[in-house]
């Protein structure tokens, strides 16, 4: 048997956005129903290198298919300036659950961007107003691209407002999407008054307050991925309907981690997990039992999302003879 090696371009080409969104939604369902195993994300802190490693293993049973894998990913903030390397680099090993054979080794950085966008799309589908047609984005880095690509799959987005202190990054983003959307630069408040807002920044001091968003804005808070990171002001969070992806991860390192640790925000302020809404155990925004006002999706990123997205990439690549097959285990086949 051969193991398929897939670089970042291979992952990009084979991670079909609609299929990844469906797969990530299926992962939320499996997790909520207890059909997944996902040990807590483990960290190796390396303060001497201003970085850390994270391991994210998972198994999920989606009913008509199952999948297993592990992502090994880092965050080294000095990399771009000192080593001309990305801040975040990831490697995904995707395995056959029945035999444990490593079916694929793929770039986990591109995979993370794809599944992160897909997670925001799932949340947007359930938590935003059904007729949402405008999207604001705070932070014009690499994650902003997949936010727009994925969310546009679940809502008819026409207007896009992007806000970032780096004018060059904003210009690059506008150039990338100018032919598809009415996209322009704007302030945080202009972005926040769109129907949907995605925040994708690594800040530790909140940059979005209640005055910066509309009465019914849905916010995908995607930037916080470590203790101390915090994009949204406490009073905004406390007045919003908060939906999380996982209680343990969100209270430790998600958007709510800072006010939760301080006792400002408690479990009573959390509406529920996204899986509860996807399976119908709690209502989303739509319907007579749905909620109104501002909503926040606190997304820390789950290993089951990586596994679900990796399956999409592997299956499509394998069917279309993409990637580089090699004899990793030396079985001589």
Pin down the residues of each PLM region.
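Short acidic low-complexity segments
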Residues: 180-194, 204-211
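N-terminal ligand-binding/catalytic initiation module
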Residues: 1-108, 121, 131, 293, ...
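An anion/phosphate-binding loop that grips the pyrophosphate of nucleotide cofactors and donors
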Residues: 194-195, 240
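Short glycine-/small-residue-rich Rossmann-like dinucleotide-binding loops
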Residues: 201-203, 223-224
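Adenosine-phosphate binding glycine-rich loop
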Residues: 230-333
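Glycine-rich adenosine-cofactor-binding loop
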Residues: 117-120, 127-169
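Short, conserved loop/helix-junction motifs that constitute active-site signature segments
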Residues: 156, 211-216, 235-238
């Amino acid at each position: 048997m051969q193991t398929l090696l897939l670089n970042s371009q291979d992952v990009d080409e084979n991670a079909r956005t609609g299929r990844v969104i469906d797969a990530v939604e299926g992962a939320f369902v499996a997790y909520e129903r207890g059909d997944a195993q996902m040990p807590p994300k483990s960290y190796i802190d390396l303060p001497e290198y201003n970085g850390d490693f994270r391991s994210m293993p998972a198994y999920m049973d989606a009913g008509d298919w199952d999948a297993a894998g592990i992502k090994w990913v880092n965050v080294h903030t000095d990399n771009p300036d000192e080593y001309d390397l990305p801040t975040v680099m990831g490697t995904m090993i995707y395995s056959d659950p029945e035999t444990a054979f490593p079916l694929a080794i793929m770039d986990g950085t591109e995979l993370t961007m794809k599944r992160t966008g897909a997670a925001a799309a799932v949340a947007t589908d359930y938590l935003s107003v059904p007729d949402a047609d405008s999207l604001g984005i705070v932070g014009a880095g690499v994650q902003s691209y997949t936010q727009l690509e994925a969310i546009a799959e679940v809502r008819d987005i026409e207007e896009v407002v992007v806000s970032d202190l780096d004018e060059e990054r904003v210009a690059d983003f506008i150039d990338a999407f100018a032919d598809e959307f009415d996209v322009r630069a704007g302030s945080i408040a202009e972005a926040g008054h769109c129907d949907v807002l995605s925040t994708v920044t690594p800040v530790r001091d909140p940059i979005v307050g209640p005055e910066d968003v509309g009465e019914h804005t849905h916010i995908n808070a995607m930037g916080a991925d470590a203790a101390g990171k915090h994009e949204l002001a406490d009073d905004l969070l406390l007045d919003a309907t908060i939906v999380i992806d996982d209680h343990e991860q969100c209270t430790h390192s998600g958007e709510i981690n800072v006010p939760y640790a301080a006792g400002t925000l408690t479990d009573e302020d959390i509406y529920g997990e996204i899986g509860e809404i996807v399976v119908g155990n709690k209502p989303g925004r739509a319907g007579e039992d749905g909620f109104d006002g501002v909503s926040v999706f606190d997304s820390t990123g789950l290993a089951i999302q990586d596994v679900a997205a990796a399956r999409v990439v592997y299956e499509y690549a394998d069917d279309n003879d993409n990637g580089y097959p090699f004899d990793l285990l030396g079985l001589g086949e």
